[in-house]
Amino acid sequence: MPKKISRRLQELRKKVEERPYEPKEALQLLKETATAKFLEAAEAHVRLGIDPKYTDQQLRTTVALPKGTGQTIRIAVIAKGEKVNEALAAGADLAGSEELIEQISKGMMEFDRLIATPDVMPQVAKLGRLLGPRGLMPSPKGGTVTFDLTKAIDEFKAGKLEFRADRSGIVHVMFGKTSFSVEDLLINLKALQECIDRNRPSGAKGRYWRTIFVSATMGPSIEIDVSSLQDLKLTEAA
């Protein structure tokens, strides 16, 4: 059964032309179409020319958003001994060892990011069925399996995000809040674009970037001209 589109969204869609917009113009329109009764996220949806069923065409990495995410990130850390105290001193919201693993196994999910030291990963691996579907399983590629807990916690609190291409080769990333200025959103979006280009999978063939759309959480999709975004220098974005 087709999903019913709200009258609010129908009206907002009328403001968006079916064409690729220049980056700044698109982000201004994104802000104008953020009319929900809560502070919406600014989202990017990037379709890439990859087939993630092949290991050399998978994309999973992290990006540090220069202007932050606009969110308060709750971080949990699983470690042993003094590393637990180090994590708490560095600003982790939760930290523990076997007892924290047990709490999570019983359904406690009061965190947005889970970091683990390499020596506890055999125990953490048992939580895969719970953590995997939620995108919370620690991984070296995601920067969430490390002994350098202070650095990892600082980076994620400051605006570091992990993202991956889904089965269709589409990347969905939140790159700020609609309360951000157009300039700050553009700086974050440019950082995301450069990160995706830097981490192009070795098996990607042909045209890598297919499309990029941005939107507010409850707003209409707005297409951005890929070449214009790639050609933009960060000094221009600033």
From Swiss-Prot:
GO cellular component: large ribosomal subunit
Protein name: Large ribosomal subunit protein uL1
Recorded family membership: Belongs to the universal ribosomal protein uL1 family.
InterPro entries referenced in this protein's UniProt entry, alphabetically: Ribosom_uL1_bac-type, Ribosomal_uL1, Ribosomal_uL1-like, Ribosomal_uL1/biogenesis, Ribosomal_uL1_3-a/b-sand, Ribosomal_uL1_CS
Gene symbol of the encoding locus: rplA
Top-level taxon of origin: Bacteria
PROSITE patterns, per database record: RIBOSOMAL_L1 (PS01199)
Function: Binds directly to 23S rRNA. The L1 stalk is quite mobile in the ribosome, and is involved in E site tRNA release. Protein L1 is also a translational repressor protein, it controls the translation of the L11 operon by binding to its mRNA.
